Swiss-Prot record:
Homology family: Belongs to the eukaryotic ribosomal protein eL8 family.
Alphabetical list of PANTHER family matching this protein: RIBOSOMAL PROTEIN L7AE FAMILY MEMBER
Chain positions found as Phosphoserine: 19
Keyword RNA-binding carried by entry: yes
Function as written in the Swiss-Prot or TrEMBL entry: Required for ribosome biogenesis and telomere maintenance. Part of the H/ACA small nucleolar ribonucleoprotein (H/ACA snoRNP) complex, which catalyzes pseudouridylation of rRNA. This involves the isomerization of uridine such that the ribose is subsequently attached to C5, instead of the normal N1. Each rRNA can contain up to 100 pseudouridine ('psi') residues, which may serve to stabilize the conformation of rRNAs. May also be required for correct processing or intranuclear trafficking of TERC, the RNA component of the telomerase reverse transcriptase (TERT) holoenzyme.
Cross-link Glycyl lysine isopeptide (Lys-Gly) (interchain with G-Cter in SUMO1), where in sequence: 5
Cross-link (Glycyl lysine isopeptide (Lys-Gly) (interchain with G-Cter in SUMO)): 5
GO process annotations (BP): rRNA pseudouridine synthesis; snoRNA guided rRNA pseudouridine synthesis; telomere maintenance via telomerase
Quaternary structure and interacting proteins, as annotated: Part of the H/ACA small nucleolar ribonucleoprotein (H/ACA snoRNP) complex, which contains NHP2/NOLA2, GAR1/NOLA1, NOP10/NOLA3, and DKC1/NOLA4, which is presumed to be the catalytic subunit. The complex contains a stable core formed by binding of one or two NOP10-DKC1 heterodimers to NHP2; GAR1 subsequently binds to this core via DKC1. The complex binds a box H/ACA small nucleolar RNA (snoRNA), which may target the specific site of modification within the RNA substrate. During assembly, the complex contains NAF1 instead of GAR1/NOLA1.
Signal peptide (residue range): none
Subcellular location: Nucleus, Nucleolus; Nucleus, Cajal body
GO molecular function: box H/ACA snoRNA binding; mRNA 3'-UTR binding; telomerase RNA binding; U3 snoRNA binding
Name listed for the protein in its UniProt record: H/ACA ribonucleoprotein complex subunit 2
Gene designation: Nhp2
Species of the source: Mus musculus
Length: 153
């Protein structure tokens, strides 16, 4: 008796995983009331690409504690916050911190997708992307669009 490889079952599982992905509009249902300025669908995709490139160069800060520590030290970059994080008290002080330090920040709809963009299986509620010459063009485009978003009052 030999083992039979389960290749057909794996491909079925992958197909099911693809069907479980939620659309941008479905993700908007779970947003917090403080999730402003919110990135558009196109900007969200650009940010994910920039984050993936930054991870390869190890130019990101991940998590509330680490991001807050380096913002207070004066590090510059784009702060990307997940709009579906609960309770909001976990990270509601970060936009104020960004405004004090003149850092651009933007909300995206899903913490799960934000974590996946970093190559992690865990959801992540905040990431700071630092500039680097390897992906400077992508970073500059994202920075320009994030700064063009209207800031909340």
């Amino acid at each position: 008796m030999t083992k039979v490889k389960a290749a057909p079952e794996e491909s079925e599982a992958q197909a099911e995983g693809c069907s479980e992905e939620r659309t941008y509009k479905e993700l908007l249902v779970n947003l917090n009331p403080i999730a402003q300025p919110l990135a558009s669908r196109r900007l969200t995709r650009k940010l994910y690409k920039c984050i993936k490139k930054a991870v390869k160069q190890k130019q990101i800060r991940r998590g509330v504690k680490e991001v807050q520590k380096f913002v207070n030290k004066g590090e510059k970059g784009i702060m990307v916050l997940a709009g579906d994080t609960l309770p909001i008290e976990v990270y509601c002080h970060l936009p104020v911190l960004c405004e004090d330090q003149n850092l651009p920040y933007v909300y995206i709809p899903s913490k799960t997708d934000l974590g996946a963009a970093t190559g992690s299986k865990r959801p992540t509620c905040v990431i700071m992307v630092k500039p680097h010459e390897e992906y400077q063009e992508t970073y500059d485009k994202c920075l320009e669009e994030v700064q063009a978003l209207p800031t909340p009052l």
